[in-house]
Each structure stands twice: as structure tokens, then as C-alpha cells.
């Protein structure tokens, strides 16, 4: 099957380019070095100094052809609907939900696939929306393609990881992942979803159709995985054993219905980072606002 992330088709109009800048922190610092993770994450990150910020630019290719970009939110509908909103107790979920930026659909799209491999086997229609329709059948094989109306540029050595919205399963269709070398590539890319069966799916107006975030090129080659017994690191083992004993004691108390444990509901000592309600990612802004942020200037 063809690559899931590819250059946009040739009929994409190349018009006046506008750019939207973003400040991307490349490192953060702890307010208090002792305020580290007790069992999972106790870190409270302070804003990085302005000189450590780098730009992630989204060049708008054509006048009148755009799409909303927002920091990925912490909330998910299925998490909201769960009993007592229990999934929000999982810190890894909350952090992952917010890791990146989402591109939103500009149309209410209905797509139907008949199960065949031809591109004619996928029918796409707009049920309403503004601007050009960015969704169509191009590759066949049950792949639904969203045209992205931006050309992204990252600093040297940085790629973009492009995928579907995190922890947001969609019945009947699956987002395909891709990594774009946006520090040198001067071609656009498409976001693609592949049907898992012959069916009809819909994407609502402002529904996320793409999530992206920067990743440093070559970082995998910097690591060498190795196996060790936990007892090889006595301090690390001691911390784990204390956590494990505490967790087992808590779960035993729940099972036995101990009032003080039931009243507590769940252990919260690893949830410090989740108390920070601010999005992890900075919102996109026009280039003048970004430049003022870098220099510390004020004003509209």
C-alpha cells in the first residue's frame, strides 16, 4: 500500500503564503529539584526561558483555505462518560491526551466504503461546512484522505509525528501514523484514515482529524536497550518495593471494605502533574505575536 502520509495532489492551489508561528519549549526546569516523582509524576514544570523556545511554523498555502489548530485537550468524551470519570485517575492518559496539537475538520463529512480496493469504492460527501472540502478518496484500499492546508516547518533536526487524536478510538476507521522531516521538506502531507470494514463513518465540524508534535530526529539511535535485574539498583528497588507494598495494602483495604480506604477512593500521590489544568502545548499565534513573546514585548 502506498505511504499513508504523502505530498498533496497536484491540483492543490498554491497561493499567497501566510505563516502562523508557535513557540516550542525544548527543555523545562523544575521549580524545586526535590519536588520529583514520588511514584509516577510529582513534577511541576515552570515556563521555559524565552531564549530556549523555538518556532514551529504553519504556512497557510492559500487565501481562504485554512483549518483550526488547537492544543490537544485533556478531556475525552469516553472519559467524561465513565463512572466517576475514573479514567482521569490515570496520569499517563492525561499527559498523552494533551501531547501535541490537533487540526480540526472544517466540514461535516460522511464517508462510505464498499470494501473494494479501488478509489471509486470510497464515497465522500459534505453535509455542511465552510471553505474547501479537504476530504476525498485518493489512494484506494479503503483509505480516507484529508488534505492539510498548511506547509509546516520545524527547526533543523526536528521532525513532525503525525497521527490521529490520542486515546480517541473511532468505530470503523483507524488513523494512520507518519513521520515528516519538516525541517527540509518543502512538500505538504495528507492525513489518512483506513477503514477497518465496509461501513459508513462521519466526522463532525471541528472534530479532530489529525494530531502532530515535534520529535527530534535520530533520538532512537541515541539509546541502547538493556536488561537488568531490579536488584542491581538497590535505591530504585527500594522505592519500587515501598510503592508496591503501599498499593497492595490499599487494594486489600478496598477489597475488605475498610471505611477509611473506601472513603479515600483511590491513591492520589502520583497525580500532582494532573492538577495543572493548563494545556501542555502553546496555542498557535500570528508571527508578530510570537516575535513579541520571544522578545518580551507587550501590546496587541
Ranges and model annotations:
Residues 1-185, 199-300:
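Non-catalytic terminal segments and appended small domains
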Residues 184-192:
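Aromatic sugar-binding surface patches on proteins
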Residues 193-198:
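Short alpha-helix capping/helix-loop boundary micro-motifs
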Amino acid at each position: 500500500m502506498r505511504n499513508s502520509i504523502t505530498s498533496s495532489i497536484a491540483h492543490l492551489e498554491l497561493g499567497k503564503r501566510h505563516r502562523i508561528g508557535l513557540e516550542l519549549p525544548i527543555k523545562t526546569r523544575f521549580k524545586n529539584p526535590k519536588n520529583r516523582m514520588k511514584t509516577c509524576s510529582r513534577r511541576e514544570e515552570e515556563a521555559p526561558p524565552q531564549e530556549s523556545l523555538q518556532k514551529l511554523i504553519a504556512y497557510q498555502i492559500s487565501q481562504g483555505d485554512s483549518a483550526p489548530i488547537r492544543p490537544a485537550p485533556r478531556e475525552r468524551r469516553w472519559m467524561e462518560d465513565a463512572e466517576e470519570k475514573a479514567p482521569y485517575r490515570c496520569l499517563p492518559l492525561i499527559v498523552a491526551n494533551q501531547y501535541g496539537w490537533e487540526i480540526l475538520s472544517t466540514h461535516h463529512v460522511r464517508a462510505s466504503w464498499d470494501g473494494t480496493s479501488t478509489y471509486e469504492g470510497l464515497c465522500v460527501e459534505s453535509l455542511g461546512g465552510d471553505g474547501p472540502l479537504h476530504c476525498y478518496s485518493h489512494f484506494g484500499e479503503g483509505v480516507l484522505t484529508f488534505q492539510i492546508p498548511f506547509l509546516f516547518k520545524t527547526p533543523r533536526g526536528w521532525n513532525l509525528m503525525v497521527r490521529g487524536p490520542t486515546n480517541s478510538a473511532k468505530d470503523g476507521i483507524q488513523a494512520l501514523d507518519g513521520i515528516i522531516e519538516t525541517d527540509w521538506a518543502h512538500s505538504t502531507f495528507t492525513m489518512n484514515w483506513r477503514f477497518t470494514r465496509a461501513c459508513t463513518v462521519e466526522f463532525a465540524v471541528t472534530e479532530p482529524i489529525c494530531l502532530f508534535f515535534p520529535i527530534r530526529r535520530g533520538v532512537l539511535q541515541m539509546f541502547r536497550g538493556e536488561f537488568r535485574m531490579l536488584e542491581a539498583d538497590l535505591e530504585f528497588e527500594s522505592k519500587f518495593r515501598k510503592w508496591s507494598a503501599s498499593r497492595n495494602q490499599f487494594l486489600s483495604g478496598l477489597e475488605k471494605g475498610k471505611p477509611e480506604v473506601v472513603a479515600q477512593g483511590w491513591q492520589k500521590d502520583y497525580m500532582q502533574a494532573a492538577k495543572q489544568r493548563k494545556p501542555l502545548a502553546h496555542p498557535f499565534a500570528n508571527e508578530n505575536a510570537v516575535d513579541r513573546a520571544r522578545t518580551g514585548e507587550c501590546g496587541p
